Amino acid sequence: VLSLPNTGVNTDKLNILEELVGNFQKDFSFLTVDEIYELIDKIESRPKKYSAFVSGAAAALACGAFIFLLGGGWPEMICSFVGAGLGNFTRAKMGKQKITTLASTAVGVAIACLTYMACFRILEVAFQVSAQHEAGYIGAMLFVIPGFPFITSMLDISKLDMRSGLERLAYAITITTVATLVGWLVALLFNYHPENFIPLRLSPLLLLLLRLPASFCGVYGFSLMFNLSLIHI
C-alpha cells in the first residue's frame, strides 16, 4: 500500500527538474541509467531552503497583505498576520515530523483561527475595535488554500492528462474541504459570526497606492512558502 505522509508545492525542486529536462541532451545524455536515478534521488532529497520560522513569517506577510486586498482594514491585517504566521509555523513543524498533510492542515488552520480570535479580543479590549472586524477571520487560513494545484489541475485536464489533473484536483478539493470544515467548526464552537468587511473609506488613488505594495507582499510571501529560490523571484 502506497502512503504519502505529506506533500506540497516545492518550486525549488521543480525549477531544478525543469533545468535538468531542458539541458538533458547537452549535459546529461552521457550518464547511465543508474547515474540518472542517483541524480534524481539527490534532487528529491534536497532539504527546504527556509526554516519553519521563515515559512510562518512568509504566510503572515502574505495573508496580512491579501486580507487588505480583499477589503480588510488594519485590525483584520494584524490579526490575520499573527494567526497565519503561527498556523503555518505549526504546519511546517508538523510537516518536518512526517505527519500527514490532512492532520497538519487541520491543526494549522485551527491554531490560525484561534490565534485570530485571541488577537482580535485583545484589540477589542485595548482599542475598542468594532466587532465587524471579525470579517477578517478567513484571512488567517488563506495560507492553506491550494491555488497552485487547482490551476495546474485545470491545465492538465485541458491537455487531456486526466490522471494528473484529477489527482491534483482531488488533492486541492480535499485540502480546501478540511480547512473549511475546521474553520467552520472553530467559529461554531466559539460563537463567532464574521460578516462583510467595513468599507475602508479611502480614495481610489490612495487605495491603488496601497494595493501595489500589498500585492507584492502577498506574492512574495507565497513564493517563500512554496520554497522558491530568491534568485527566481
What is each of the regions a protein language model found here?
Residues 99, 130-131, 156-166:
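Juxtamembrane helix-boundary/capping and inter-helix hinge elements in multi-pass membrane proteins
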Residues 231-233:
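Conserved small/polar residues in nucleotide/adenosyl-binding loops
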Residues 116-125, 181-191:
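Hydrophobic alpha-helical transmembrane segments in multi-pass integral membrane proteins
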Residues 156, 166-175, 187, 206-208, ...:
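Extended, low-hydrophobicity, polar/charged segments
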Residues 124-132, 191-203:
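Membrane-interface helix termini and inter-helical loops of multi-pass transporters
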Residues 213-223:
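Oxyanion-binding "anion nests"
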Residues 49-152, 221-227:
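Core alpha-helical transmembrane segments of integral membrane proteins
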Residues 1-38, 42:
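Soluble N-terminal domains of membrane-associated systems
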